[in-house]
């Protein structure tokens, strides 16, 4: 009986864990496409777009971000210092160790391309761009364009030159109409 109960419990966990859906806290005006998943430990700001089959765990995401399909943010990593990397042995360990701890922090107005992976304990600055297919293992400065495996800085966006003025407007704290008006009145948008 114990074996059947154990199997049923693990099946229920698999159903819950792998069921796609929006379980996170999120702000106004967000768009979540088919197959999107974000766990309860994720917090999402306003007016973000999330592409199909994107998976997010343990992340804090600002506002006005554009996240393409098939992006993975915050996947856990196995303990490489352990005798075995198998999670199947965790039930028998005296001191259970979870997959990598730490959250991902993504600023405002960040663009993340298709098939990007952002590992835990990484901070992505405002206005950054992560090129398609990149694996981001380290922090990304504001307005940097990064790409590759592992991701490296390619260059900075032209908005970087106006970063101080952009930050003063705090445009990402407003609804689209007010945000556009602020940017236009400060000469930051045509």
Region locations from a protein language model:
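Flexible, glycine/small-residue-enriched loop-and-beta-strand segment within the central core
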Residues: 16, 38-45, 49-120, 157
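Extended, small-residue-rich solenoid/repeat segments and analogous flexible loops
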Residues: 1-38
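ABC ATPase nucleotide-binding domains
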Residues: 179-190
């Amino acid at each position: 009986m114990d074996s059947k109960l154990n199997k049923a419990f693990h099946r229920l966990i698999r159903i819950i864990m792998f069921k796609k859906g929006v379980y996170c806290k999120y702000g106004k005006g967000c768009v979540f496409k088919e197959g999107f998943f974000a766990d309860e430990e994720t917090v999402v700001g306003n007016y973000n777009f999330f592409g199909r089959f994107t998976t997010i765990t343990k992340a804090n995401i600002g506002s006005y971000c554009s996240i393409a399909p098939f992006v993975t943010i915050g996947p856990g990593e196995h303990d490489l210092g352990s005798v075995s990397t198998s999670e199947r042995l965790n039930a028998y360990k005296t001191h259970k160790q979870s997959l990598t701890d730490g959250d991902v922090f993504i600023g405002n107005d960040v663009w993340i391309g298709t098939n990007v992976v952002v590992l835990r304990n990484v901070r992505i600055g405002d206005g950054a761009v992560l090129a398609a297919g990149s694996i981001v293992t380290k922090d990304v400065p504001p307005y940097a364009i990064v790409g590759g495996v592992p991701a490296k800085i390619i260059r900075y966006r032209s908005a970087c030159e106006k970063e101080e003025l952009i930050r003063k407007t705090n445009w990402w704290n407003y609804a689209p109409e007010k945000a556009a008006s602020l940017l236009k009145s400060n000469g930051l948008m045509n």
